[in-house]
Amino acid sequence: MSVLVPMVVEQTSRGERAYDIYSRLLKDRVIFLVGQVEDHMANLAIAQMLFLESENPNKDINLYINSPGGAVTSAMAIYDTMQFVKPDVRTLCIGQAASAGALLLAGGAKGKRHCLPHSSVMIHQVLGGYQGQGTDIQIHAKQTQRVSDQLNQILAKHTGKDIERVEKDTNRDYFLTPEEAVEYGLIDSIFTERP
């Protein structure tokens, strides 16, 4: 099923110019991460962040997140780019930021991580399902544990929680209201109106 993307028409000195809504918002330094985090989405988000950095390395990038999570490698590529680019990346949860989405939400610039009032945040451990020979399963289990440890370290760094607390909380699905996400350190504030 194809999705129609709304168009926006702007008046310029040279006439009218039509943009799809996401391209128009990109001009205002807004990037949307919506749906499953996967390689294609990650490549688009990374390209947009790099483009915005080249346009103005001193102006914040706004990352709007509404995601149930997805592939850890894709999320880590986005996260690493968020940390790499010179502009601060402001994050805003609109709807949900679960799993990989919560990691990206927390990975925004300190003091610039936000939720809307009826959003939901969820953290948990890395999920994996493997089959095959026993030795292959052991290899994948070690890798899953290594990545899980890495993600817990990142969450501990951005929340200020000790690693033992993060490991305990991510052992199962851990849902947080925006107020709880502020208290936990995943975000800094809740937007009830435009700042």
Swiss-Prot record:
Name of this chain's protein: ATP-dependent Clp protease proteolytic subunit
One function term, GO molecular function aspect: ATP-dependent peptidase activity
Oligomer and partners: Fourteen ClpP subunits assemble into 2 heptameric rings which stack back to back to give a disk-like structure with a central cavity, resembling the structure of eukaryotic proteasomes.
Biological process according to GO: protein quality control for misfolded or incompletely synthesized proteins
Keyword DNA damage attached: no
Similarity comment: Belongs to the peptidase S14 family.
HAMAP family from the UniProt entry: ClpP
Cysteine-cysteine disulfides: none
Tagged with keyword Transport: no
EC number(s) recorded for this UniProt protein: 3.4.21.92
One cellular component term from this protein's GO annotations in UniProt: endopeptidase Clp complex
Principal localisation: cytoplasm
Function: Cleaves peptides in various proteins in a process that requires ATP hydrolysis. Has a chymotrypsin-like activity. Plays a major role in the degradation of misfolded proteins.
UniProt-listed InterPro entries: ClpP, ClpP/crotonase-like_dom_sf, ClpP/TepA, ClpP_Ser_AS
Swiss-Prot/TrEMBL keywords: Cytoplasm, Hydrolase, Protease, Serine protease
Catalyzed reactions per annotation: Hydrolysis of proteins to small peptides in the presence of ATP and magnesium. alpha-casein is the usual test substrate. In the absence of ATP, only oligopeptides shorter than five residues are hydrolyzed (such as succinyl-Leu-Tyr-|-NHMec, and Leu-Tyr-Leu-|-Tyr-Trp, in which cleavage of the -Tyr-|-Leu- and -Tyr-|-Trp bonds also occurs)
PROSITE patterns (alphabetical): CLP_PROTEASE_SER
Compartments (UniProt record): Cytoplasm
Cited PANTHER family: ATP-DEPENDENT CLP PROTEASE PROTEOLYTIC SUBUNIT
Catalytic site positions: S99 (nucleophile), H124
